[in-house]
């Protein structure tokens, strides 16, 4: 009986040991599976994190490239605008210089023309002064000396004298002469200075009355002669 009980005990022990071993194996397998799951999860998390980092780095690279391209485009536009502004300013400066040169040339030409005209006038005046025309006295003398030649009338002499140039002294002397001219039709006497300037004669009241009487008589006779009233 004792032997049988010992066998039963050994069998129960072996069964309990087998159960414990199976439990331990199941626990180990569950632990291994949990470990494998955790490792796979960690690996997936790591992979996802690495992919997220790569995407972020790509986005950053794209942003940096965009910012660099925008900065380069802005710099190129600013450089082009600066070059255009500099070229426009240079063009304006060149135009201003060209206009100034034209103005200077025109001024120089005008000055040269004025100098030439002044020189020509001075030469003409000098020649006229050096070679004055003959006066009336010279014509009278020549006419008196040349008795055999044709005699010139007063009109011809005046025409010849008008054609000849006169000096300033001769002109002043001619204009300073005052003479009395009597109108043959009316009998009026006038004071004429030079070529035709009429002067007023200052007289007394009595002389003024006599002059008016003579003038009215002469005017009446001239009117009657024109009208044919006189015999």
From Swiss-Prot:
Domain of life per record: Eukaryota
Organism: Rattus norvegicus (Rat)
Intracellular or extracellular location(s): Nucleus, Nucleolus; Nucleus speckle
UniProt cross-link Glycyl lysine isopeptide (Lys-Gly) (interchain with G-Cter in SUMO2), position: 193
GO cellular component, one term: nucleolus
Protein name per Swiss-Prot or TrEMBL: ADP-ribosylation factor-like protein 6-interacting protein 4
Biased composition (Low complexity): 64-89
Residue(s) carrying Phosphoserine: 142, 176
Lineage: Eukaryota, Metazoa, Chordata, Craniata, Vertebrata
Family to which the UniProt record says this protein belongs: Belongs to the ARL6IP4 family.
Subunit-level organization: Interacts with ARL6. Interacts with ZCCHC17. Interacts with SRSF2.
Gene: Arl6ip4
């Amino acid at each position: 009986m004792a032997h049988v009980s010992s066998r039963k005990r050994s069998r129960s022990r072996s069964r309990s040991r087998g159960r414990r071993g199976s439990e331990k194996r199941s626990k180990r397998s569950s632990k291994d599976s949990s470990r494998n799951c955790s490792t796979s999860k960690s690996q997936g998390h790591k992979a996802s994190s690495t992919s997220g980092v790569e995407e972020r780095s790509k986005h950053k690279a794209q942003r940096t490239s965009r910012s660099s391209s925008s900065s380069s485009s802005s710099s190129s536009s600013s450089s082009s605008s600066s070059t255009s502004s500099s070229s426009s300013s240079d063009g304006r400066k060149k135009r201003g210089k060209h206009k100034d040169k034209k103005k200077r040339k025109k001024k120089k030409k005008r000055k040269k023309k004025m100098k030439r005209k002044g020189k020509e006038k001075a030469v003409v005046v000098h020649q006229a002064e050096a070679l004055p025309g003959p006066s009336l006295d010279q014509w009278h003398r020549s006419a008196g000396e040349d008795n055999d030649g044709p005699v010139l009338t007063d009109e011809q002499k005046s025409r010849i004298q008008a054609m000849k140039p006169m000096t300033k002294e001769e002109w002043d002397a001619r204009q300073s002469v005052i003479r009395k001219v009597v109108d043959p039709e009316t009998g009026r006497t006038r004071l004429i200075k030079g070529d035709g300037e009429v002067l007023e004669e200052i007289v007394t009241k009595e002389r003024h009355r006599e002059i008016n009487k003579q003038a009215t008589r002469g005017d009446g006779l001239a009117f009657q002669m024109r009208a044919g009233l006189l015999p």
